[in-house]
A protein has these predicted regions:
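Acidic/His-leaning functional-site neighborhoods
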Residues: 90, 94-174
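HotDog/MaoC-like acyl-thioester-processing domains
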Residues: 8-85, 139-143, 150-175
Length: 175
């Protein structure tokens, strides 16, 4: 989840990030962007999964690795549920295939790319104030993506799904 204020071109900023919790194979991390006076311009919360890269499966973080992290207090904000609920009625849009430039070094779609894809369904005058994303499964090169969009007067919700309508990612934007 992320909230923002408008920035000014050339504005000096400081980006900060810190872990605040680990549970099982989940890691929790906050981010802030501050202006030159230390005022918060943007803040975000993220949840990460610790992976065993050889087995390509989630793994518990080791005690040794936990010792390397210095936990800090979580940022004071409203924390959204991890899962984004899909509305029953969504409008299906034209499908498309995953392209090579959307793939990361792990050979699947980079998480930022899902957000960029979802932004394509926003109207031009939609001013994003808050965004959250739920990543459900990895799309790979050549996969076909079936977008489904829901909109009301305050928000847009985009599900980027496979041919069985199972989401790769769900992205929610609020004005």
């Amino acid at each position: 989840e992320m909230c923002i204020r408008d920035r000014v071109l050339g504005e000096k900023i400081t980006v900060k990030t810190w872990p605040y919790n680990f549970k099982g194979f989940y890691g929790y991390r906050n981010f802030t962007i501050e202006d030159a006076e230390g005022k918060i311009c943007a803040y975000a919360d993220s949840q990460w999964i610790f992976m065993d890269l050889k087995r390509e499966r989630p793994a518990r973080i080791s005690d040794k690795m936990l010792e390397e992290y210095q936990m800090e207090e979580p940022f004071k904000m409203d924390y959204a549920d991890r899962k984004i609920k899909l509305p029953e009625k969504m409008q299906e849009k034209e499908s498309f295939q995953i392209r090579p430039e959307q793939i990361d070094t792990n050979h699947h779609v980079n998480n930022e790319q899902y957000i960029a894809m979802a932004k394509n369904y926003l109207p031009e005058n939609f001013n994003i104030h808050k965004m959250r994303a739920e990543y459900r499964k990895a799309a790979v090169l050549g996969d076909k993506v079936f977008p489904f969009v829901y909109a009301d007067d305050k928000m847009y919700l985009v599900s980027l799904a496979d041919e069985e309508q199972k989401p790769y990612a769900i992205v929610e934007f609020e004005q």
